[in-house]
Every structure is written in C-alpha cells, then in structure tokens.
C-alpha cells in the first residue's frame, strides 16, 4: 500500500521522521508530499525542504518525496496513493485533523485518513517550536537531523 504523507515540513523534525519510518513499516511505501503554499512564507524553499527530506529518509525503504500544490485528495489520486497518513501529538491535533479528514472524504470518499499517535518523546515537537528555539540560539539537534539544524543556524546567524 502507498500512504500519502502531506505537510509543509518547514523544517522536517524527528517527529515527522518517526511517522515516516512507521508508515513505511506499516504500509510499505510512503509518498511525502511537500506543500507549496505561496500564501504562506516558508523558512526554506520547497526545493530545499525536498532535499532535506530526501537526505533524512535515504535509509528508510519505500520513501519518495514530491512537491504539490492544491488539494491533498487530488495529490493522492494523481499519485495512486491508497490512504492519507497523519500524525497526532495532542487532542487539539485530533480535532483539527478530523475536520480535515472529513473534508477530504467529502471531496473524494476513496481516501481514508489513518492517524498515528506520535511517540511520547516527540509529542512536544513542531516545526514552529524548532524554529522558535533556533531563533533564540537554543539547542535543536535533538529535534531535527544535524544538517537541518545547521541550515537553521545559518539562517539565524545572517
């Protein structure tokens, strides 16, 4: 089975990587779809985020990374995905993700959304938290791969 894992991944965190690994173990194939959203100012370009993800997932079998614009269900359909994969850190994530899952089903009922609970030690992680800690010079190497930490440090020293 092929799972579509959509997101902005700005930047990719160890929480994302854990979900990708577990998705690969469960479904065999994970298509990581990086959202290109021109109305949202990204820290890293879409191309750079794709490079970061490809580097971070090179040892995870069945992973592929693409850019996408538009609706998640359209991306799933165009790439022959079987399901949509999403992670949950807290109850607040569930409320939002459930609404998105229902919206996706209303647009194309072919796609189920499968939720995986984040590992407890990653439950505090979000891309926003990582960027905030990095902005103030805090240690982030336990939150993101080393090369992403270096990318963020370069941005914050310029």
From Swiss-Prot:
EC top class, as a word: transferase
One Pfam family this sequence matches: CTP_transf_like
Residue numbers binding substrate: 8, 40, 72, 86
Site positions (Transition state stabilizer): 16
Recorded GO CC terms: cytoplasm
GO BP annotations listed: coenzyme A biosynthetic process
An example Gene Ontology molecular-function term: pantetheine-phosphate adenylyltransferase activity
Gene3D superfamilies: HUPs
Any coiled-coil regions, as ranges: none
Keyword vocabulary terms for this entry: ATP-binding, Coenzyme A biosynthesis, Cytoplasm, Magnesium, Nucleotide-binding, Nucleotidyltransferase, Transferase
Residues annotated to bind ATP: 8-9, 16, 87-89, 97, 122-128
Main location per the UniProt record: cytoplasm
Cofactor(s) listed in the protein's UniProt record: Mg(2+)
Location of this chain's protein in the cell: Cytoplasm
Biochemical pathway: Cofactor biosynthesis; coenzyme A biosynthesis; CoA from (R)-pantothenate: step 4/5
Catalytic activity, EC: 2.7.7.3
The reaction(s) this protein catalyses: (R)-4'-phosphopantetheine + ATP + H(+) = 3'-dephospho-CoA + diphosphate
Entry similarity comment: Belongs to the bacterial CoaD family.
Subunit structure: Homohexamer.
Cited NCBIfam families: coaD_prev_kdtB, cyt_tran_rel
Functional note: Reversibly transfers an adenylyl group from ATP to 4'-phosphopantetheine, yielding dephospho-CoA (dPCoA) and pyrophosphate.
Name of the protein in question: Phosphopantetheine adenylyltransferase
Source species taxonomy: Bacteria, Bacillati, Cyanobacteriota, Cyanophyceae, Synechococcales
């Amino acid at each position: 089975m092929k799972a579509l894992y959509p997101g902005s991944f700005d930047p990719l965190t160890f929480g994302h990587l854990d979900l990708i690994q577990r998705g690969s173990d469960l479904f065999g194939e994970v298509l990581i779809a990086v959202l290109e959203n021109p109305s949202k100012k990204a820290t890293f370009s879409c191309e750079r985020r794709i490079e970061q993800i490809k580097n971070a997932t090179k040892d995870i079998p069945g992973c592929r990374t693409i850019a996408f614009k538009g609706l998640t269900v359209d991306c799933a359909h165009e790439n022959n995905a079987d399901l949509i994969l999403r992670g949950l850190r807290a109850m607040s994530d569930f409320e939002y993700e459930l609404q998105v899952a229902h919206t996706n089903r209303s647009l194309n009922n072919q796609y189920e959304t499968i939720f995986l609970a984040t590992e407890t030690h990653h439950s505090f992680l979000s891309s926003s938290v990582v960027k905030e800690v990095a902005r103030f010079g805090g240690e982030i190497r336990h939150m993101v791969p080393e090369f992403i930490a270096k990318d963020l440090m370069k941005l914050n020293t310029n």
